[in-house]
């Protein structure tokens, strides 16, 4: 029994360092919020202005890697000897489900406002040119390019899972071909895993920080309960308790059902917005935006704005590339696990086509609706943000639709379910990554899962206390820096091992 407890207990070298680091950072932040905001602005400015180019080149190089996989020597290689575990339709639906988080609903509803009010390329704010480019930039940030980078890493993890039969719960496990078993299991591997975990904790905390205000603003709109930081903290606490109950009572099946409900409700809500907002305009705007994307793509790929220094690529493109980098390993592991039995080419094409369609539908429908409301002067987003915050502005874009009460109820349920599944996924991923020899299909210890969900909740509350989007953007960018190198090492390790062991 003692040996069994040791096996399923925490792994101290990857459990305590992230816990201590994140705990200290949260404590320092809460001690002096004003000083923390000064540091946040300095970190954001340094990383985006000094190293933003590196994130842009990373995405471009990974795009070339995608073409190499699709048309290169491994294109027809199968990821495992078994037939595909899921039908193509189910596989693509699962991909779509992974895109419908509350954070995605947050950005999809408000992102276009920022693009047209502070546009790139020296365009006049709120001008025709800015509006023509607004959705095109969303399609760029959430389109084929980032999904192509995920394709490469998904192939890498699927190769390690199903071809090499490796148990991978932390990125260091994949680095044996690159640095050797001694270093991968030694200090170097421990450092890599700690970088990954700290970054992942902050990423999940930021997602919670984006999702929670949407739920509390819905509560204010529906029930008249004032939106305060205390209410945010209460809601986050309720999610943590609900997650603990689900785990303790073996209700994981219920969580999976909730995830399916979230996906179907997402389709329903998007369909509703598409129909009542203006289907003809949405399709015309999308078509025009694809053309604008193709026209400006080379400039977008390499846009750093070093002369005019308007800040658009730093505030948005670099931020989003860091967002994609920081979630790459977690997301790619999930996508790899549902892709057993598929060929490399099939996985690459399926991800780029299926996931791009998912994100493009979300951003096109929600962004077009927001633009229509702005153009018709139905809502005043700048005033809403200044007086009440970004979350209220997002809620008003939904409340402006017909049958507003029913619409807000649907949005409220969607955000609530999305965040419940987010907290559950957060606690599971972090617990799996910080426990000793918990294999796929087994459950990590209950207290470890609850502990991590509490810490992620604390980070969400701290980011909300700081106020505004800049702390959230900075947390993502700071976390993305170390994972930038981790992702590259995983990629190189796959290439090296495949060259030696994946021959005809």
From Swiss-Prot:
Cellular location(s): Cell inner membrane
Highest taxon of the lineage: Bacteria
Transmembrane spans: 10-30, 51-71, 92-112, 143-163, 195-215, 231-251, 263-283, 316-336, 347-367, 398-418, 446-466, 475-495
Cross-referenced InterPro entries: BCCT_CS, BCCT_transptr, BCCT_transptr_CaiT
One GO-annotated biological process of the protein: carnitine metabolic process
GO CC annotations, alphabetized: plasma membrane
The protein's name: L-carnitine/gamma-butyrobetaine antiporter
Membrane topology note: Multi-pass membrane protein
A GO term for molecular function: (R)-carnitine:4-(trimethylammonio)butanoate antiporter activity
Record pathway: Amine and polyamine metabolism; carnitine metabolism
Quaternary structure, from the entry: Homotrimer.
Organism: Escherichia coli O8 (strain IAI1)
